[in-house]
């Protein structure tokens, strides 16, 4: 495929990707795709460096949304016990442990539809406290108003996560209580407040190839591109609508990572949920395809994650260095 042969061109950020072109990239011969993705990665990022972030559920369960993949939804009987918002000191203690363990970004997630006024101040205190430790800060709190986004930025928020989940045409199969446009509007408010955008999606939900390509095209059409792009593999939870979904073929997952790297060359592409079910070899292929960020810690919100020593053992065997505090993970554009 001629497009994959021009690495210098592929390494330039563009936001005019079409589904047709993205599909040609996704379906390219596997060796050509991986070679191109790794070449783009080396042009735009340190070749053997991966960012390590840690994610903490600061408010678990009882969510009013009906996301078909989520065990925190109040719509499904998954046996998860809902909890109130964690105390500030407990969150900061967890952040300190994350930093001591090598994490350079600390992410805080709350299971609710939107940030409520009564919780704004304590959330801002959490952000300020983590920021004072020298780590990057990230939260995922559902929908926001413009004033809330500005308040979070003033507290020191670096990144806001709000995933698109899937392609627009596949979205109604996954969730009915929030529209696709709601998600786009929230991301626009985040960007307008000067906060970096973290948005991606979930694969392995029974979607077809076209939906995966559609999701990636939506993300790569954002101007500017999201700074962080988490690619999650569904962790199927019993008693949720998507609990019987079959895992996505590993090669298809790697194709998704590689295509994300090519379409969004300067974004951090994160291996997120689902790594616990992946072999070391599959994860290594994902790093080869351009993934350069992971979550460390035993849990991602409420789903299992590889133990941190397993991750660093894998890094050692692959010659990968964890990103240090203050490093950006990108090579300056020429």
Curated annotation (Swiss-Prot):
Pathway: Cofactor biosynthesis; biotin biosynthesis; biotin from 7,8-diaminononanoate: step 2/2. CDD domains: Radical_SAM. One of its GO terms (molecular function) is 4 iron, 4 sulfur cluster binding. Keywords: 2Fe-2S, 4Fe-4S, Biotin biosynthesis, Iron, Iron-sulfur, Metal-binding, S-adenosyl-L-methionine, Transferase. [2Fe-2S] cluster binds at residues 107, 138, 198, 270. Its cofactor is [4Fe-4S] cluster; [2Fe-2S] cluster. NCBIfam families: bioB. Belongs to the radical SAM superfamily. Biotin synthase family. This is Biotin synthase.
């Amino acid at each position: 495929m001629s497009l994959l042969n021009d690495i210098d061109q592929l390494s330039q950020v563009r936001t005019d990707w079409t589904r047709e072109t993205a599909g040609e990239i996704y379906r390219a011969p596997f060796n050509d795709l991986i070679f191109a993705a790794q070449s783009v990665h080396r042009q735009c990022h340190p070749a053997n460096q991966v960012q390590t972030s840690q994610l903490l559920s600061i408010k678990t369960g009882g969510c009013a949304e009906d996301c078909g993949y989520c065990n925190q939804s109040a719509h499904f009987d998954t046996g998860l016990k809902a909890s109130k918002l964690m105390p500030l000191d407990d969150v900061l203690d967890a952040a300190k442990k994350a930093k001591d363990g090598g994490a350079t970004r600390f992410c805080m997630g709350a299971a609710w539809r939107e940030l409520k006024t009564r919780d704004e101040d304590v959330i801002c205190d959490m952000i300020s406290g983590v920021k004072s430790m020298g780590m990057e800060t990230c939260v995922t709190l559902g929908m926001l108003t413009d004033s809330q986004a500005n308040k979070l930025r003033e507290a020191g928020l670096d990144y806001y996560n709000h995933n698109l989940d899937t392609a627009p045409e596949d979205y109604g199969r996954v969730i009915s209580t929030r529209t696709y446009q709601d998600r786009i509007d929230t991301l626009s408010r985040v960007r307008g407040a000067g906060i970096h955008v973290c948005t991606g999606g979930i694969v392995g939900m029974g979607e077809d190839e076209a939906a995966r390509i559609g999701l990636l095209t939506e993300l790569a059409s954002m101007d500017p591109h999201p700074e962080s792009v988490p690619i999650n593999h569904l962790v199927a939870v019993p008693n949720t609508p998507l609990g019987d979904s079959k895992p996505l073929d590993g090669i298809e997952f790697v194709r998704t990572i590689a295509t994300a790297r090519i379409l969004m060359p300067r974004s951090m592409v994160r291996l997120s949920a689902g790594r616990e079910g992946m072999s070391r070899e599959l994860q290594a292929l994902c790093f080869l395809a351009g993934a350069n960020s992971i979550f460390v810690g035993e849990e991602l919100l409420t789903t299992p994650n590889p133990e941190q020593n397993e991750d660093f053992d894998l890094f050692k065997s692959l010659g990968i260095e964890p990103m240090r505090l203050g490093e950006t993970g990108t090579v300056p554009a020429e």
